Design a protein with these regions (language model features):
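Cleavable N-terminal export/targeting peptides
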Residues: 1-35, 272
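Subset of outer-membrane beta-barrel
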Residues: 27-273
Length: 273
């Protein structure tokens, strides 16, 4: 057994250990926080855009245009980078969506492919559902694991300017290679105080972890520029970001601050036909 082989094994072990301990962005932990969501501390269960496919598929039911999106989240190390693409197609019966996300590097990675459907029954209520295929690969003799799970969400618009959203990821308690995939509940409300100011608050509960409380704000600075900020608990984090909107193009940059690990940036770009 030569020194090069030992070094490669050591690097692989350290990388996998680090990813498992500081796995904040793992797909299967549902920490997909694209630019705007990251900037608002992930108070995203009531937001309506192409990114509803990751946060609450009920939001897809209100989309009026074909949309494409791509995002990239930079991890604390490059092996923790997460990226993905999404697509939404409104039809007469509802909106069909598809998404793909990839996390990790050649020695350890996770993939998720999702197919979603969202429908608004009235302007006051919508429902969304998504089926996911999950895949995890660990190099060497560790092998791979695969699974299927689903998620469901609802949105209510009871009065002008007020939105209430609820979402459950993996209510079936599916497992991956004998390990439980997290089951996560999200509940949130948002209120549009004016054409320029949106305030959202929410709570997130993983069945195996303490509840998270979060709040975020979106402020339209000028016609083409918006600012976002947010805070959340367990652990304490704060976030901020900026959005650019021109014609049918939307771009966001969000920064999420972890009290121990520092800032992580997220970038998104979407286009509406």
């Amino acid at each position: 057994m030569n020194l090069a082989f030992i070094c490669k094994r050591l690097i692989l072990f350290v990388s996998i250990f680090f990813l498992s301990v500081v796995n904040i962005y793992a797909i299967q932990d549902r920490k997909i926080e694209e630019g705007k969501a990251a900037a608002m501390a992930n108070t995203s269960v009531t937001l309506i855009d192409i990114w509803s496919i990751y946060h609450n598929q009920a939001g897809l039911g209100y989309l009026e245009h074909i949309s494409f999106g791509a995002f990239h989240q930079s991890g604390f190390i490059k092996e923790q980078n997460l990226q993905g693409i999404s697509f939404a197609l409104p039809t007469k019966t509802g909106t069909i969506g598809a998404s793909y996300s990839y996390y990790g590097f050649s020695q350890y990675n996770e993939m998720q492919a999702g197919l979603a459907f969202g429908r608004s029954f009235t302007k006051y209520f919508s429902v969304g559902l998504q089926l996911n295929y999950l895949y995890t690969h660990i190099a060497g003799n560790y092998g791979t694991a695969q699974s299927v799970d689903f998620e469901i969400g609802i949105l209510s618009h009871p009065i002008n300017n007020l939105m209430i959203g609820a979402h459950v990821y993996n209510p079936s308690r599916s497992k991956m290679g004998g390990e439980e995939i997290p089951t996560i509940f999200n509940l949130g409300i948002s209120y549009l105080f004016s054409e320029k100011v949106l305030l959202g608050i929410g709570t997130e509960k993983d069945l195996n972890r303490d509840a998270i409380f979060k709040a975020g704000i979106d402020y339209e600075l000028i016609d083409y520029v918006s600012l976002q900020a947010g805070i959340s608990t367990n652990p304490s984090k704060y976030s901020f970001g900026i959005g650019f909107h021109y014609l049918k193009i939307n771009a966001h940059v969000g920064f999420l601050n972890h009290q121990t690990l520092g800032f992580t940036p997220s970038f998104t770009l979407s286009y509406d036909l």
